[in-house]
Amino acid sequence: MFNWRAIYNKILYLLLKIVVRSHIIPPKLLAEICLDIQEPMMYVLPYNSKCDLLTLRILCIQYQLPDPLKPIFIXGVRFPRYLFIDQSCHIRSDVTKQQQYGRILHNFITLYRHNSCSNIQILPVWVMFGRCPGKESYKNKKTTSIQFFCLLKKIINVIWLGRDSFIYFSPIGSIPISYIANSNYTINSIMILKLFRLGRIHFLRQKRIAIGPSLLVRKHLFEKLLASQTITKLVEDEARSKKISIKQAQQKALVIIEEIAADFSYETIRLSDRVLSWIWNMLYQGLYVCNADRVRKLAEKGHEIIYLPCHRSHMDYLLLSYILYHEGLVIPYIAAGINLNFWPAGQIFRKLGAFFIHRTFKGHQKLYSAIFREYLYQLFNGGYSVAYFLEGSRSRTGRLQAPKTGTLTITIQSMLHLGKKKPIILVPVYISYEHVIEVASYTKELYGVVKKKEGLIHMISGLRNLRNLGRGYINFGEPLPLLTWLNQQVPQWQDDINSIEGNRPNWLALTVDYLAVTIMTRINNAVAVNAMNLCSSIILASRQYSCSSIVITRTRLLSQLKCYLELLRNVPYDAEVTVPNVTPEDLFQHLITLNQFTIKNNSIIYVSSEKTALITYYRNNIQHLFILPSLLAIIIIAQPGISRKLIHQKLLSLYPLLKVELFMRFSYQELPHVIDLMITELHRQDILYEQQTKIYPVPKRMDELQLLAASGGRETLYRYAITFSLLCSYTRINRYSLEKQSIIIAQHLSKIHSIYALEFIDKTIFSTLITTLRHEGYLSDSGEIHASQAKEIYKFLSALISPEIQTSITNALYHIKTVVN
């Protein structure tokens, strides 16, 4: 006699193997959900679906997990390896089915209690075909026609969305069946119903994590925005001031809303996923993601997540959304500059969740800023994930830029405006690449070339740079719970909930500034160290300023790589930093594949003068990791036999400037201990030695110490020396003049000494430096200079820079003062 059910299952299984290609969530399955494949397990699914069960079976066989169709035995009693919570995704289980599932669960728990030696793992699994938001589950309808249409819809979904299916595995214990089994609770029908209810809640929560709330309908959104009290008042003011009708003013507001608002499209996301998967595989040698599991856990707890990534490239928009989608998380609404709103990129980005904003609201009307603020309120209130770049624009130097706090201010205002204690989590995100396609244009912009406007022609011309881009890295940093943080920093913030629109609390500006710096510091803490940024640091350090090109031997590069890797591993900057767990030789072999350098006979690395400026971008990605070791090496080379105490004093005097400029994490109290750890590590590497509390370089390892000294610290000292020389030359100088003259001298030094560091002539970095000098008391708001403090620092700096650089600064300063007078 034929087993028709087995034949049916086999045919369906083979068809699904052809049609379905599932993504597993989480990608690192065994590690994240604490699964022991040696122990027996039972799969719990949300509803009875043969397609889902067989799709799960395909994946289980692929990953060598227990086959869900094979039963498990407890004390000789046979149980199915799977359990359904409900009969259908749209229909609550009928009484018969509910009782059947209930009996299975009751018998399972009873036998589990009597066989305590058994450690059976309960694994909740949800198979999802497509992730289009807005679908409702568990409707209380039950008719034959509805069941028929559900089946038809399932068939269509499997065929149409089979290549876009996701299988979500929840951690062991997400549905507390094992906990109940191990407890003293009485197992009766009420307890079984409670367990089923907990299962439904878990899967509903899982659905929210995966697909988010229903998509915003643009028409309804526009009506909501226009109906808000703030915008209604501003529309009336606009009509009155411009002497136009209310309808014309509303039309003007609608144009602004149209310009800003995203237009999410799930089909566009599906198509883009296919295209981007092909692009990443073709152009990159891999995408490396770290700590995505911590974001997933936050989402599981019901937190609303705001992603705050650093900004390196236009690729960031696509990469962040792509990674989140493949990690099983909702794609966020992401802020994009209005410069990207050109055909066809603007329409595509908008369909992928981009909303467009001007880089600054200065010069724009009140109506625009009010509409943008109200739009963000709607996103936050609706529970949508949001992402925006605190830096405001792409970094041209490879470092983090000073944060733009406008959108962050609106984020905090939204909590006050909505009057709710929403569990908002700010997630810093570090994004980096071994090859940034725009880096050549960044260099030109810093040297004064006018930035080209983005457009279709510009985009097409940039496609020729899309080749061999190495690896991409995305690290999710330490999350910051906004509510908890506000309670610590501003305990009285709740007094301003529902405050009058337009009246900012007195504490808001300073709080936002401090919050922005905290986020930027956490982004830097999550830096990804890779072959390109490590080797770029060493290669640039080996350059002689009299030479435009660079030549370094393989042996020298490998020796310094070993030094740097050991320093990063043994004196970690932060636990969030990711350091490649490979040998220096492995890094070098990977460097060869990037084709960024000319390598002769596999032993000599040659870098042209044109490339020298470009690779400073990658060195700057990790400059905050090596700035303290670099300055330490400079001090010891300049003053061999210096004491630890004096080293502490010198570095502490510069640290306020470094901390602000590079968003460094150490407090002033921690710094001496960190310096001592670095000295100890360099002593262990036989690069330094200590004699009678004095620190000396080891002569035979002087080359390693000199390369370490040149890893970003020298150019920093040159910039500081320029600005402090100006402070010592005047009794009073305004901020604008100090900044302008510092840049002129820096440009002069850059030209005559071939200093290619991108940040060396960056106006924003000098602006940040001068702001810090004011905060530290070297310069008053009125322009008065505290000469004694400035002269003390300049004397210290002069002892650390070469006589040639010092002479050039003096000559340039004399020339400037002559012109001014």
Swiss-Prot record:
Lineage summary: Bacteria, Pseudomonadati, Pseudomonadota, Gammaproteobacteria, Candidatus Palibaumannia
Membrane topology note: Peripheral membrane protein
SMART domains in the record: PlsC
Main location: membrane
Localisation per UniProt entry: Cell membrane
Short sequence motif named HXXXXD motif, residue ranges: 310-315
Catalytic reaction(s) noted: sn-glycerol 3-phosphate + an acyl-CoA = a 1-acyl-sn-glycero-3-phosphate + CoA
GO molecular function, one term: glycerol-3-phosphate O-acyltransferase activity
Keyword Nucleus listed: no
Protein name per Swiss-Prot or TrEMBL: Glycerol-3-phosphate acyltransferase
Alphabetically ordered keywords of this record: Acyltransferase, Cell membrane, Lipid biosynthesis, Lipid metabolism, Membrane, Phospholipid biosynthesis, Phospholipid metabolism, Transferase
Keyword Cell cycle tagged: no
Pathway the protein takes part in: Phospholipid metabolism; CDP-diacylglycerol biosynthesis; CDP-diacylglycerol from sn-glycerol 3-phosphate: step 1/3
Family from the record: Belongs to the GPAT/DAPAT family.
Short name of one Pfam family: GPAT_C
Origin superkingdom: Bacteria
GO BP annotations listed: CDP-diacylglycerol biosynthetic process; fatty acid metabolic process
Top enzyme class: transferase
InterPro entries recorded: GPAT/DHAPAT, GPAT/DHAPAT_C, GPAT/DHAPAT_LPLAT, GPAT_PlsB, Plipid/glycerol_acylTrfase
Name of the gene: plsB
GO cellular component assignments: plasma membrane
Entry remark concerning the domains of this protein: The HXXXXD motif is essential for acyltransferase activity and may constitute the binding site for the phosphate moiety of the glycerol-3-phosphate.
PANTHER family recorded: DIHYDROXYACETONE PHOSPHATE ACYLTRANSFERASE, GLYCEROL-3-PHOSPHATE ACYLTRANSFERASE
UniProt-listed Enzyme Commission number(s): 2.3.1.15
